[in-house]
Amino acid sequence: MRTKKNPPLRVGIGGPVGSGKTTLLEMLCKAMRAKYDLVVITNDIYTKEDQRLLTVAGALEPERIMGVETGGCPHTAIREDASINLEAVDRMQKQFPDVDIIFIESGGDNLAATFSPELSDLTIYVIDVAGGEKIPRKGGPGITRSDLLVINKTDLAPYVGASLPIMESDAKKMRGERPFIMGSVKLGDGLNEIIKFIEQKGLLVS
């Protein structure tokens, strides 16, 4: 179990544009902030829009949400050259020395994006049903190697013609023993399971 003497748990959240990463972050912060000391680092290419959205939503106090403008390719800032994010992590740790969890949201990326091990202790990859039922079987590191895959917006399946059983079957084939969760985080469906995963895999509970 982690204690205050341990470094904070760093949780990377990735996924394509519109999959629900920022909504998941908002819901996680609101559900976990009473129990844990939290900060968030968001990545956008040319703006700090996700930082603004989380601040307006009241996810955390504004000073606990830092926006990073990556420029160029968003994958590079979380993988090949994570220095800009590592610097942000260091700044947040100095500002909030008792922080328990640092959430790091990647910019909208494709299925090939992954977090550098030096940046993230746990990775959560978010895809959504509206992207099509074929997404899980397309694979890519985010789907096959993330610590947790979240198949989001299951409530939209009837409206986009996606088969949830097919998506579930494909996710099992692509991930093997690695866990995945199907739900709709905006509605709270699956949120408790995601929190439980973070707590158990991040050694936040004994």
Swiss-Prot record:
Coiled-coil portions: none
Full protein name: Urease accessory protein UreG
Superkingdom in the source lineage: Bacteria
Protein family: Belongs to the SIMIBI class G3E GTPase family. UreG subfamily.
Pfam family, one: cobW
Subunit organization: Homodimer. UreD, UreF and UreG form a complex that acts as a GTP-hydrolysis-dependent molecular chaperone, activating the urease apoprotein by helping to assemble the nickel containing metallocenter of UreC. The UreE protein probably delivers the nickel.
Database matches in InterPro entries: AAA+_ATPase, CobW/HypB/UreG_nucleotide-bd, P-loop_NTPase, UreG
Recorded GO MF terms: ATP hydrolysis activity; GTP binding; GTPase activity; nickel cation binding
UniProt keyword terms in alphabetical order: Chaperone, Cytoplasm, GTP-binding, Nickel insertion, Nucleotide-binding
Biological role: Facilitates the functional incorporation of the urease nickel metallocenter. This process requires GTP hydrolysis, probably effectuated by UreG.
